[in-house]
Regions:
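Gly/Gly-Pro-rich "capping" loops immediately C-terminal to redox-active cysteine motifs
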Residues: 26, 30, 45-71
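Short amphipathic alpha-helical/adjacent loop interface patches that line ligand
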Residues: 33, 37, 65, 76
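Short acidic/polar micro-motifs centered on Gly/Asp/Asn
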Residues: 15-17, 42-47
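Post-cleavage N-terminal segment of exported redox proteins
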Residues: 1-25, 71, 85, 98-103
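Axial heme c-ligation environment in periplasmic c-type cytochrome domains
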Residues: 49-56, 71-103
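A broad, structure-centric signal for solvent-exposed, well-ordered loop/edge residues
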Residues: 8, 39, 47, 62, ...
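The canonical Cys-X-X-Cys-His
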Residues: 29-43, 94
Length: 103
C-alpha cells in the first residue's frame, strides 16, 4: 500500500512539473542536446553509437514526457543518468527539441 501511495505521489509531482503545451524552450533544448546527447544519438537524431536510440524516427518518442524524463534522469543501458547533471526543466526542453527531429 505504501509503495502504491508513493508511486501516486511521485507521478502527481512529475505531472506538476510538466510544462504547459508550447512552454518548452526549444533553443535551449537544442543547445543542451548538442552538448550532452548528440555524440551518442547523432546531431540530427539519426543515431551515433550502437544501442543509442534514433530520434529521427518516432518509435522511441511515442513514450510520454514523464516516461522519457524518468529515463533521462536514471539512465538506461549504456546511457548515463543525467538526473544530477540537468534539471527537470532542462530535460523537458531537450525532450521537446528531440520531438522536432522526427521525419
Amino acid at each position: 500500500m505504501r509503495r502504491a501511495a508513493f508511486a501516486l505521489l511521485a507521478a502527481a509531482g512529475a505531472f506538476a512539473l510538466a510544462p504547459a503545451a508550447g512552454a518548452a524552450d526549444l533553443a535551449r533544448g537544442g543547445q543542451i542536446y548538442a552538448l550532452h546527447c548528440a555524440t551518442c544519438h547523432g546531431p540530427a537524431g539519426q543515431g551515433g553509437i550502437p544501442g543509442a536510440p534514433k530520434f529521427n524516427r518516432g518509435e522511441r518518442l511515442m513514450q510520454s514526457d514523464f516516461t522519457l524524463l524518468a529515463t533521462v534522469r536514471r539512465g538506461r543501458n549504456v546511457m548515463p543518468a543525467f538526473g544530477g547533471v540537468l534539471r527537470d526543466r532542462e530535460i523537458l526542453d531537450v525532450i521537446a527539441y528531440v520531438r522536432t527531429l522526427q521525419r
